Amino acid sequence: MDDHPRLGLTVDASGCDEDNLCWSGGVLVMVGADEDWGGLVARAVAEEWAGMELLAGLGGTVGEVVAGNGAAFGQQVADVVWSVRTWDSATASKRTFAMAECNFGQETSRFAVADGERGRYDVLEVTFLLRDGTLSAPVRDEALAARLGVPVGSRLELAPARDAVLGA
């Protein structure tokens, strides 16, 4: 349980919850904004939830990475966000944004704020739509493909793809 400094609320951000959409080949994973991004990616790989394995090297919390639309090796967070639940400080209420409403751009989103500033929306929880499977997204980054010794466009097992990104 973490105390939310702006709201005077206690927010339980311990872990994530999943909703398996096996009929569609996807899984919705709901994660608290204060969870560690690297831990989420590690869990996704272990659970065989594909779509964020090439983002393993991004640092920070889930909320921070989503607000900055973290990107690496041809993947970006916006590719796997389903929705973002926030606290709207202007209306003093919770508000959920569908991915299309998040205004994702290169390393930015509706939730990004400049250093030292307060934004209107505090990210509370993010729901990701990941693929249920063992293969990575196609490797689009030439340097990563060369490091792995595979052609651009190849798909890899999730763990080796994550390990290559982390330099293991």
Locate each region found by the language model.
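Phosphate/pyrophosphate- and phosphate-bearing ligand-binding catalytic cores of soluble enzymes
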Residues: K94-A168
